């Protein structure tokens, strides 16, 4: 009764769209958005109940409208350095339709911005991250050292923070780390030693596109006709200039098998975004088996 009344009060408090999410880690698949994943207050309450069977609390908050971007920063406790921004596409199907996933693909541009943003928004994200790093030290007395991967959204009222992860993004790391010209060991050492401010991190001026090859049943509800199509054998042909990053796969005596999650990250790197996309799309087409991907 208590949870029902509390959730009901929050749901009726929102005049416009809102979202419901887990108060915890769910691999990027726990958020449901009004208008996309549910439409009525009854459906919203049903999802709240489901969340509360797995977690002690549920998040109900305003839905923000805008373009999202990922900014993976490195921090030595005092200095925060941003890597080129990336846009991740979490929805399972073309045109950003269907359920959220851990990420079906991502891209970055050769100018180290994105088509809908400038360096101004990158700087705003970096400033927010710097303030968070300072707040961590102020509140805990400890210097945070490592990756601060922020999810941001550009709204009509400016750049807003959605979340932080203390790790690289998946798939966003596959867009950025191949472009890093500075020795990554030197970067890690500078983070440990607190000397990141002395290191000039350099990235190639290249565009990247990452597309995930996934089982046909990946991310689908149990009642979907393809939901049971998960683990299966796959064969990989000539991928040309693309890079492959193996994820949820199992090498057996008779070949390579997908498991139930994202199988292979296929990355194209080129001077332009369109060429990088062409490389990735051509390569993912030679992965044979019951696989799916986002051709867009």
Regions found by a protein language model. Name each.
Residues 258-296:
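Generic C-terminus detector
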Residues 30-173:
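Internal nucleotide-binding/catalytic subdomain
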Residues 35-36, 73-75, 213-215, 268-270:
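Short beta-strand-to-loop capping motifs
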Residues 123-149, 165-241:
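Active-site "cap" helix and flanking loop/linker of ATP-utilizing ligase/carboxylase catalytic domains
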Residues 227-265:
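Generic long, charged, amphipathic alpha-helical segments
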Residues 93-96, 198-200, 249-256:
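Short beta-strand/turn micro-motifs at beta-sheet edges
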């Amino acid at each position: 009764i208590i949870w029902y009344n509390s959730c009901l009060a929050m749901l009726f408090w929102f005049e416009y769209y809102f979202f419901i999410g887990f108060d915890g880690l769910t691999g990027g698949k726990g958020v449901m958005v009004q208008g996309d994943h549910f439409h009525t207050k009854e459906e919203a309450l049903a999802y709240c109940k489901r969340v509360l069977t797995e977690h002690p609390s549920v998040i109900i908050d305003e839905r923000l409208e805008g373009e999202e971007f990922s900014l993976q920063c490195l921090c030595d406790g005092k200095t925060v350095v941003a890597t080129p921004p990336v846009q991740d596409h979490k929805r399972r199907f073309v045109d950003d339709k269907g359920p959220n996933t851990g990420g079906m693909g991502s891209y970055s541009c050769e100018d180290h911005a994105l088509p809908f943003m400038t360096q101004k928004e990158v700087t705003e994200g970096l400033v927010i991250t710097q303030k968070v790093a300072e707040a961590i030290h102020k509140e805990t007395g400890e210097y945070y050292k490592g990756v601060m991967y922020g999810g941001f959204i550009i709204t009509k009222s400016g750049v807003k923070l959605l979340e932080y992860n203390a790790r690289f993004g998946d798939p966003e790391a596959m867009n950025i780390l191949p472009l890093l010209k500075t020795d990554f060991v030197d970067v890690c050492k500078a983070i440990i030693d607190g000397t990141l401010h002395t290191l000039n991190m350099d990235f190639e001026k290249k565009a990247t596109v990452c597309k995930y090859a996934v089982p046909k049943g990946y991310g689908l509800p149990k009642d979907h006709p393809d939901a049971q199509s998960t683990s299966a054998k796959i064969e990989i042909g000539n991928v040309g200039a693309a890079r492959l990053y193996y994820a949820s796969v199992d090498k057996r005596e008779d070949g390579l098998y997908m498991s139930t999650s994202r199988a292979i990250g296929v990355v194209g790197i080129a001077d332009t975004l369109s060429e990088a996309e062409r490389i990735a799309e051509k390569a993912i087409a030679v992965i044979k088996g019951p696989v799916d991907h986002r051709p867009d």
